[in-house]
Regions:
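Non-catalytic accessory segments of hydrolases
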Residues: 1-162, 435-450, 460-466, 485, ...
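Mobile gating loops/cap/lid regions near enzyme active sites that modulate substrate access
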Residues: 69, 384-514
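Serine-hydrolase-like catalytic core of hydrolytic proteins
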Residues: 72-249, 304-327, 396-398, 463-464
Length: 542
């Protein structure tokens, strides 16, 4: 039993056996409200404290989810929808639920394009982190119209905009007040997320109002959560019109959330291949965190350039095939179509479109079909270019991109994030996805040079980062081990396994051609004195 500032909760003890046969025991506390149910007058308001309860509340089952039905058909990730009103809740997994434990904390924000996703996924329970002495907390937040619609009557009767962002802040405040009771140290918090969750943590990193809530950031395949007011207001107007109401809280409160969800899909769906304009022209996530000058004061890029969050540790990267699987159901619909006019229609120049297709042909990927080529273009423009740009913009020096290769296999982004989170011993590890050990070793010798970070890595094909302050006695602290840049010579000019060194290439512009398959990793440090030009001797066992 653990006592929070709203009341006592009772969790359950679970056992976990890892792939290497290690067994560990951890406690789980699920569905704990961190805010009042966002219904009635609170539906479009800022989050408010939950109603306190007497006695001991059962916390052995996941709580209600903001997602009522998955927007992905078929679902790509096991993220269940659970009915109920108390949708703003947190689930905690801890190896030691005692106030004296003082363990590091990982707070995870799920993805789903800000219209879907669930904190109740079995992929997010954090068993492996608990095994290695890390407390995990998974937050929910309002989605779609409920969380991100731009309402014209904001400022009256408690109505606010950027409600989903305010939910993140409120959840992190709950962590600061309560995580010590679960064995966590509120001064050692790392926030993490993948896809829209990665965008969320980058958004939080660049918000002055959030700086006291965490010390490190893990952003996996983040998109740019910096929608302009005009784009969000227009998307809100279209959804409201299709749903039979005005873009105000007063009018929208009479419409059920499922109606907004259905028309959000019909009006502007990023999974509809008949609307390729979303790739280059329009904001792909219009109902998303909005730069309003108040909650979100600046774009992520501008805030990074201004040095906001420069004292925080940052791990940022993206999968090479972030969006290809999203277009897989449309493979037959797009089969045989020339991708060049589709890319031009999407806003790319004809020269760029032909470059994209030619690059796919050179890599032998054109035979995979038009859906694959379009998916790669979306991955590059929406996700991978953000990673390179933000790492370069990060105050403290340039950060050329690096990659680990995966033999051309398709990367399923959340499954990779899940494996990273669930199997790494107190670290986030990115490595080749498929193939035998022997084949992987051959691949490493052939094309995986060593890292050129100031500290080096244990393996040329594996990148690790330990969350803040999780290093054990006798080992370097996480600050000492934090890399500035992870980069590999075939693409960036860093020193290779053979000891050769070529001229570094700058990070790709968003309009550049897609990069080879694999996993893109960028590591950016808060320490400006650590720069890739500092050549170091490779160290083993880091």
């Amino acid at each position: 039993m653990v006592t929070t500032d709203s009341g006592a909760v009772r969790g359950a003890w679970h056992e976990h056996t890892s792939a290497d046969g290690r067994t560990s025991r951890h406690a789980v506390f699920r569905g704990i409200p961190f805010a009042a149910a966002p219904v009635g007058q609170l539906r479009f308001a800022a989050p408010q404290p939950p109603v306190a309860w007497d006695g001991v509340r059962d916390a052995t089952q996941f709580g209600p989810t903001p997602q009522r039905i998955s927007p992905y058909n078929p679902p790509r990730v096991p993220e269940p929808s659970i009915p109920g009103e108390e949708t703003l809740n947190v689930s905690v997994t801890t190896p030691d639920p005692s106030a004296s434990a003082g363990l590091p904390v990982l707070v995870y924000i799920h993805g789903g394009g800000f219209i879907g996703g669930s904190p109740a996924s079995p992929w997010y329970v954090g068993e492996a982190f608990a095994r290695d002495g890390v407390v995990t907390a998974v937050l929910s937040y309002r989605l779609g119209f409920e969380g991100f619609a731009w309402l014209a009557d904001a400022g009256r009767d408690g109505v606010v905009n950027n409600r989903g962002v305010l939910d993140w802040l409120f959840g992190l405040e709950w962590v600061q007040r309560n995580i010590a009771a679960f064995g966590g140290d509120p001064s050692r918090v790392t926030i993490a997320g993948q896809s829209a969750g990665g965008a969320a943590v980058m958004r939080l990193l660049t918000m002055p109002s959030a700086q006291h809530l965490f010390q490190g950031v893990l952003a996996l395949s983040p998109a740019d959560a910096s929608s302009p007011v005009e784009a969000t207001a227009e998307a809100t107007r279209r959804v409201a019109q299709a749903s039979g109401c005005e873009p105000t809280a007063e009018s929208a409160s009479r419409v059920h959330e499922d109606v907004f969800f259905a028309h959000r899909e019909a009006v502007d769906s990023p999974r509809d291949p008949s609307q390729p304009r979303i790739i280059f022209k329009d904001a792909p996530l219009a109902l998303a965190p909005c730069v309003d000058g108040e909650v979100c004061e600046q774009t992520v890029s501008d805030a990074l350039a201004a040095g906001v969050g420069a004292d925080k540790r940052l791990f940022i990267g993206s999968t090479a095939h972030e969006f290809t699987m999203m277009l897989s159901p449309s493979r037959q619909q797009l089969a045989g179509l020339d991708p060049v006019p589709l890319l031009v229609e999407a806003g790319a120049s004809e020269e760029l479109a032909r470059d994209v297709v030619e690059d796919a042909r050179e890599r032998g990927e054109l035979e995979r079909g038009t859906a694959w080529v379009l998916g790669q273009a979306i991955s590059d423009v929406i996700f991978r270019s953000c990673v390179a740009h933000w790492a370069q913009t990060r105050k403290g020096g340039p950060a050329p991109p690096g990659r680990t290769t995966s033999g051309g296999s398709r990367a399923r982004p959340t499954s990779r994030a899940r494996r990273t989170a669930s199997t790494s011993p107190s670290a986030w590890t990115c490595c080749p996805r498929r193939g035998s050990r022997r084949r992987s070793d051959r691949s490493r010798r052939r094309r995986s040079p060593t890292s050129c970070t100031p500290t080096g890595w244990a393996s040329s094909a594996t990148a690790r980062w330990t969350p803040p302050s999780t290093a054990t006695a006798g080992r370097p602290s996480s600050t000492d081990r934090m890399p500035v840049i992870g980069a590999w010579s075939r693409h960036t000019g860093c020193r290779s396994a053979s000891g050769t060194r070529s001229t570094p290439r700058p990070p790709p512009h968003p309009a550049e051609r897609p990069a080879p398959s694999g996993l893109t990793l960028i590591f950016a440090s808060a320490h400006p004195e650590l720069h890739p030009s500092h050549r170091v001797k490779r160290r083993s066992g880091a």
